Structure formats: C-alpha cells, structure tokens
Amino acid sequence: VLIVTTPQPYAAGVAVRAGSLAVQTGQRVIGVVENMSASVLADGTTLDVFGSGGAEAVVSGLARQSVSTTVLGHIPLTPLMAQAADNGIPLVASHAQDPAAQELSRVADALLKLTARENRTLPLSPR
C-alpha cells in the first residue's frame, strides 16, 4: 500500500490510521508520499501553503506501531500541476520540467524499484 498524505497534521493522522489498517489486513506499507508540499517560488523563497512535515509524521506514527516505512517523495503544489489536472492532462507528459512532474517521476521510479523485487499476491481469498 502506498500512503499519500498532505502536510496538515489531521491528514497525517488519517494516513497513519490507513497504514495501520493496511497492516492489520496483511498488507505492507511500501512508502509515504506527501502531496501539496511546499513550492519554491521564482525568487527562491519557499511557500508552505499547507504547512510541512506530514509525510514524516506518518512515518513516525507508523513506527510507533512497529510499522517500518519511508518517505518516497514530496510533491510540491505548483500552478502547472493544478492546470494540468483541471484539463485532464498528465503533468509529466505536458510539463516534464515542472518541479511537481520531476518529483512524481522520482516517486514512480522508487515505486518501480520497490515493486520489481516482489511478485506477491494479496493475502485475500474469496468468501
């Protein structure tokens, strides 16, 4: 299971509960991604619209429950990301140099590496 959160503490708390539920149902949490993270503005300053540290809070919260996982990335909130989403166009295809697109690509690469080592079936059976 890939846990996605935002920087806000409440969202991180919900994400910890989702990760805990995943583990209780026999699934593994392969990583945490923070969406809507800080953006770096043209003048070099950082804009944390929704705060920061949500992904790290999820990893810490899961660790307190003996669940080991890692932060795979922080997807920044960018104007092009919102525009691409509104138009139904994948950001990585339309604006590959956008910081959000670059981070999405890094997260995808990390997921490929993590899942390529596994060929597992879910521990589920029909009723």
Label each residue range with its predicted role:
Residues 1-74, 79-83:
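Conserved catalytic-core segment of NTP-binding enzymes
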Residues 16, 30, 96, 119-122:
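Residue-level detector of alpha-helical recognition elements and their boundaries
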Residues 26, 112-119:
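Secondary-structure transition/hinge residues
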Residues 85-102:
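C-terminal boundary of histidine-terminating zinc-finger modules
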Residues 99-114:
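Acyltransferase
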Residues 106-110, 119-127:
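A short, charged, Gly/Pro-tolerant segment at domain boundaries
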